[in-house]
Amino acid sequence: GSVDYRHDEWGVDVTISGSQKGLMLPPGISFNAVSTKALEASKHASMGRAFWAWDEIIEMNKTGYWPYTPNTNLLYGLSESLDMLLEEGLDNIFARHERLAEACRAAVRAWGLEIQCVEDGRHSPVLTGVMMPEGVDADQVRKLIYENFNMSLGTGLGKLKGLMFRIGHL
């Protein structure tokens, strides 16, 4: 529900997402799309599996059995969010996300800050990474924004922790 993504058309082998990714839901459901090629490769893989095997899950789906209690509240929420997305229209949603993303990037540029993106024009329509000037702790900026404006910004991940923050604009 966030970006135009075409698993089959683009020849992607495995796509994994979650209910919190553009579907207006809290975390709790995982969505998996697996190509025939990936399923076949999985059948011949020699690496042991501690948790997940595609073929076992596909067999369980055929019978309606699932190895755990599903989060029915999220499934009802998913049904509603999908109705809302289809009512607005996916092309309209994608265009809205692009507009909001560009507005966010324009604000960041107006603040005189650097946008964390390797290639200009390849920005994400769902979040903007904002680099802090040298000597400014991004996590302290996040804390100030949260305390003063009740806005939660994402932290920098890995080597970028403390150097940047992330603004989600879905």
Model-derived features: where do they sit?
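Fold-independent oxyanion-binding glycine-rich loops
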Residues: G1, G18-Q20, P27, V34-T36, ...
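Structural motif
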Residues: D13-V14, S30-F31, R105, M151-S152
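Active-site C-terminal subdomain of aminotransferase-like
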Residues: G22-A106, A110
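Short coil/turn connectors at secondary-structure junctions
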Residues: W10-V12, P26-I29, F149, K161
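Conserved PLP-binding catalytic core of the aspartate aminotransferase-like
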Residues: E114-N148
